[in-house]
Design a protein with these regions (language model features):
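Phosphate-binding loop of NTP-binding sites
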Residues: 1-114, 118-130, 144, 185
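Adenine nucleotide phosphate-binding catalytic loops in nucleotide-utilizing enzymes
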Residues: 90-91, 129-210
Length: 210
């Protein structure tokens, strides 16, 4: 079976899922992008048999109804008040987003923006897998932004990873999307040089100023 990478968050899902695809391909991992976890794609699509990973954008609506979805890597990009017509409170919305991680096991990965992680902790949400954090603002994150440099403080992988000035994408929100993709590569042991080439060449999807 191919493994799932699930990406959720209020903003940045499309850009990040495409960045993650680029990073996977740079590491010779076969991947396909999907946008709906209503169907267990791995069991249905014959072509996924040849895949290593299915990279999925996951909305809060899909997370409301999912019971069994288990991404081997779950990414939470950010949490901002959204769909307020649908949820009774921001806390409620955040709890729904956290369902991305509910079926994970201890060897799975949670890649989570520091600020989103603080919010989940305040709601007593537990992340079962191994956790990596990122942030454009918080320098205590595993990967953070300092004067345009993406810097890691992960043991055995520390130091500057990437200069945003070398990338087509710009701005702190895109820096965070890039950090999430780099951390997927780190979890899968994809060489940094290969990832950097893919990320630096990446152009934003059309109409995705975010």
């Amino acid at each position: 079976d191919c493994l799932n990478i699930g990406i959720t968050g209020t903003n940045g899902k499309t850009t990040t899922s495409q960045l993650v695809s680029g990073v996977l391909e740079s590491g010779q991992r076969k991947t396909m992008l999907g946008g709906d976890i209503g169907v267990p794609l791995c069991s249905i699509l014959d072509q996924t048999k040849a895949l290593d990973f299915l990279t999925l954008e996951v909305s809060s609506f899909q997370l409301e109804t999912t019971q069994f979805f288990r991404p081997s890597i779950g990414i939470l990009l950010n949490l901002a008040p959204d769909h307020q017509d649908r949820y009774s409170s921001f806390d409620d919305y955040c709890r729904i987003k956290s369902r991305l991680f509910q079926n994970q096991q201890s060897h799975d990965w949670g890649i989570i923006q520091s600020e989103a992680m603080a919010k989940l902790r305040s709601l007593d949400v537990r992340i079962p897998g191994k956790m990596l954090t990122f942030s454009a603002e918080n320098r205590r994150a595993d990967v953070f932004l300092d004067r345009g440099l993406v810097i890691s403080q992960i043991k055995g992988w520390s130091g500057p990873l990437l200069n945003m000035a070398d990338c087509e994408l710009s701005g702190p929100h895109n820096a965070e999307n890039i950090m999430a993709a780099l951390l997927v590569g780190r979890a899968l042991r994809i060489p940094l040089d290969a990832m950097k080439r893919a990320i630096q060449a990446f152009k934003a999807p059309a109409h995705r100023g975010e």
